Amino acid sequence: MRRRVFFTAIRKDLMEYIPTRADLFETYPVIDLDFNEEPILWGEVYEPGNMQYPLSDFKRGVWEHRQEGDLDLSGANGRVNGKPNNLFNDKFLFKDKVANTVAAGDLCIPYDEPRRRSDSEILSCSSWPRDYDFKDEKVRYICGMSVPPVMMAQVASRVYDQWLSKIPK
């Protein structure tokens, strides 16, 4: 699970209207941001045969030597090339596990196919609308650098429900 940090603030004159917690030195606002969303398993968004981003010949050669229990390409690279400390960022995606967090330079590889996640799979993992216009940017870059839209909507909803709706108009 990826933890995220959100900085929130409110004017001091509005603190009396919202939930707060105090310690020895100060009083500060509190907000519940536990969402308890259902996890998105890789198998739910996996598109078999989508070869939008195939692996390079080198990495495909390493991928072909993966074994049960490998979590990334480093184990196979150690067996094939004698370099077990390389390719550890090339993580495998397993159908029965939560899809790995999308990073800007997404290097995830489906365990079952020698390729990277496709753009549509990344959109599904990141809860982005399929018709979003990324202009000239790569989908993996924008999704990896952004807070997912569903999460932003939930944060905004919690701020309204727990803080803004309590402040007299």
Task: Label each PLM-derived region with a short phrase.
Residues 7, 125, 144:
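Short, conserved catalytic/metal-binding motifs centered on acidic residues
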Residues 1-94:
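Class I S-adenosyl-L-methionine
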Residues 20-22, 166-169:
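Short, flexible loop/turn segments with low-complexity composition
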Residues 152:
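Acidic-aromatic/histidine active-site loop/patch
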Residues 92-134:
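FAD-binding beta-loop-beta segment adjacent to the flavin cofactor pocket
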Residues 135-142:
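Short, solvent-exposed helix-loop connector elements
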Residues 156-167:
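Short, hydrophobic alpha-helical segments
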